[in-house]
Amino acid sequence: MSGQVERSYLEIKSINELIEKNKPFNDLYLEKVNPPDFQLNKFFYKEIGKKHRWIDRLTWSDRNWSDYLNSSNVKTYVLKENEDLIGFFEQIFYNDKLECEIAYFGILEEYIGKKFGGYLLSEAIKKSFNFGSKRVWVHTCSLDHKHALKNYLSRGMKIYSTETAKVKSA
């Protein structure tokens, strides 16, 4: 049995287009994961992704995770309140094109609905441009959180492509 998924590709081409969402609480801070910690990325990927059918990395070995995250063009940031983990984003920089892909982005379930998503996405976009990108892009789909697309659009990103894909039912 299979179904269909709507996938949207979004971009923002200037930091001036960003509609920034301010930090909802003063105790929040963003931390670059350095050195890379594949266990942390793996944790976020599995915890956030389990409700949204993130499956492409489920078969990755620890070596796959480590190799990917130790690439010089991959960066991970974690949002924390005090020492509690809230969410994360992964960036892949394509230096030859001066582009950055926000490859993965998400908030842990217990923090959804508390206004962290808009702030975290604002920070992801700003960090992407701070590294010299001329274009930041992301893709989302109808399996992602119901407010994911709205968040991207609310931050000033524009849809540049859509597609429908067939997926096997869970």
Question: Which residues fall in each region the model found?
Answer:
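Acyl-donor-binding surface of acyltransferase catalytic domains
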Residues: 1-29, 34
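Short amphipathic alpha-helix that is part of the acyltransferase structural core
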Residues: 22-57
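A conserved beta-strand-loop-helix scaffold within acyl/acetyltransferase catalytic domains
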Residues: 58-60, 69-76, 80-99, 103-107
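Short acidic/polar active-site loop segments enriched in Thr and Asp
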Residues: 75, 134, 158
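Conserved acetyl-CoA pyrophosphate-binding loop and the N-cap/start of the following alpha-helix
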Residues: 111, 115-123
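Conserved beta-strand-loop-alpha-helix junction that forms the acyl-donor binding cleft
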Residues: 112, 138-148, 165-170
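Conserved GNAT acetyl-CoA-binding A-motif
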Residues: 128-140
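Conserved acetyl-CoA-binding loop of GNAT-fold acetyltransferases
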Residues: 151-162
